[in-house]
Swiss-Prot record:
Organism of derivation: Bacillus subtilis (strain 168)
PROSITE patterns to which the protein is assigned, alphabetical: HTH_ARSR_2 (PS50987)
NCBIfam families: HTH_metalloreg
Gene Ontology CC: one annotated term: cytoplasm
Subcellular location: Cytoplasm
Protein name: HTH-type transcriptional repressor CzrA
Function: Metal-responsive transcriptional regulator that represses transcription of cadA and the czcD-trkA operon by binding specifically to their promoter. Binding of zinc causes the repressor to dissociate from the DNA.
CDD domains found in the cross-reference section: HTH_ARSR (cd00090)
Amino acid sequence: MTEFRETEQSAADLDEETLFLVAQTFKALSDPTRIRILHLLSQGEHAVNGIAEKLNLLQSTVSHQLRFLKNLRLVKSRREGTSIYYSPEDEHVLDVLQQMIHHTQHD
């Protein structure tokens, strides 16, 4: 039998906005390209061209995915000269991502 931990809020207490944002976050994590980008960013800050090069992706693809992730506040950016550097906005989502990676690799 599976036991569920008690949380501060029951499922019935979740408001529509919270449900929507949680669903959007899982949607973000459902895309292999976004997972690869987040995993790379979990190792340190990178510029768009560096992400594209390391992941063998087009810069336009990386920029599009970073916009998506930034809109969900999963990544943040900072400008240095002509380059924009990206890093994780919040470690919580990275923790979930790492747990899922570990879960899928577990025998």
